[in-house]
């Protein structure tokens, strides 16, 4: 972005135009304690050659060559180069919403195909393409369930991603809705899953919905049919949040759910230091008119030709704000296009094969790394993440791993105090056996777990 300076004369002219006598008067509404009265503490200006040297030195500090075992909702997968080749075409590379169907058929068709693929993956009837990410998708799903049922109490499993829960609580509390959390099972054959007995005791005729994640934050696959039976018995809706879309290549889709919230970052969307990601909402057809965001439908023009248009748009830009189902309005179509290209490249069998490869890599990693610690929730089915408890704290383990250019698992104690010595590890198709073996060698030099 260019820097466009303003001369004193420019400032005076602008102040006269808005009727302010001075800059101080313009900013008078801002309390004194929040106003900066000194010059910014920035370094001196640099010449061109100095700027080049500065950024070359910064680039040299990049973490190239590091093996990473981080997951927790943001996953490292291989991105085919064809994805950027397609999305960078001028016809697609825009943040503009495709309102004018007569000139945006390509974009609309791509969104329609994305919605179709998501429905095939999730087992739902309808899908949109315009949530910011998995967390806002889950929160919007909860708001949707409240509108559908007319109830205002929400139950969420504590095994749902902590940051997803934080976003959901933010939505709920500021709209006057009550959201309570249900514990997960700590020990036994069902460890890591939501406690079904506690859930059944908590669901009442006032419960709008039950929100679970599968695979959940611990990587464990939930018993969706059993959870659905408990929720539906009291007239509550079941929302299933999926933070790892690739799991649907190997895991049975949550067809018993009423609403599915999906994070599709794994489908060709780069990690990008946290976003933009690809949030999706899918649901049963009977809830169509309560879907937030935009939907693309198939139609015919005046000459009988197949075409695509935005339909049932209940965003605040289309209808009265008080009638809108959501105020999320950023155009996520370009990110959805990345996922569409990714799914098209791999196809149904390719996604299944890739999911099974992730499963195998994680199984090898769990068995290998588990020799130097204790695998928690080992009796429950999982996808490509697992929880490993060690004698050292995760911070100590990760410090030693970093010396070997390895980024270890995510410490869980921040959100789960009872798991202070445990970390969440992830392995995908880009994780090599050599990397797993190197990490295992570092862990093997830690004190024995029994000594803690």
UniProtKB/Swiss-Prot annotation:
GO molecular function list: glycine dehydrogenase (decarboxylating) activity
Q: Does the keyword Hydrolase apply?
A: no
Q: Which EC numbers does the record give?
A: 1.4.4.2
Task: Provide this UniProt record's keywords sorted from A to Z.
Answer: Oxidoreductase
Q: Which Gene3D superfamilies match?
A: Aspartate Aminotransferase, domain 1 (3.90.1150.10), Type I PLP-dependent aspartate aminotransferase-like (Major domain) (3.40.640.10)
Reaction equations catalysed: N(6)-[(R)-lipoyl]-L-lysyl-[glycine-cleavage complex H protein] + glycine + H(+) = N(6)-[(R)-S(8)-aminomethyldihydrolipoyl]-L-lysyl-[glycine-cleavage complex H protein] + CO2
Task: Please list the GO biological process terms of this entry.
Answer: glycine decarboxylation via glycine cleavage system; nucleoside metabolic process
Query: What does the subunit section of this Swiss-Prot or TrEMBL entry state?
Result: The glycine cleavage system is composed of four proteins: P, T, L and H. In this organism, the P 'protein' is a heterodimer of two subunits.
List the NCBIfam families: PRK00451.1 (NF001696)
Annotated function: The glycine cleavage system catalyzes the degradation of glycine. The P protein binds the alpha-amino group of glycine through its pyridoxal phosphate cofactor; CO(2) is released and the remaining methylamine moiety is then transferred to the lipoamide cofactor of the H protein.
Q: Which HAMAP family match?
A: GcvPA (MF_00712)
Report the family membership.
Answer: Belongs to the GcvP family. N-terminal subunit subfamily.
Name it.
Answer: Probable glycine dehydrogenase (decarboxylating) subunit 1
Organism for this UniProt entry:
Acidobacterium capsulatum (strain ATCC 51196 / DSM 11244 / BCRC 80197 / JCM 7670 / NBRC 15755 / NCIMB 13165 / 161)
Q: What is the lineage of its organism?
A: Bacteria, Pseudomonadati, Acidobacteriota, Terriglobia, Terriglobales
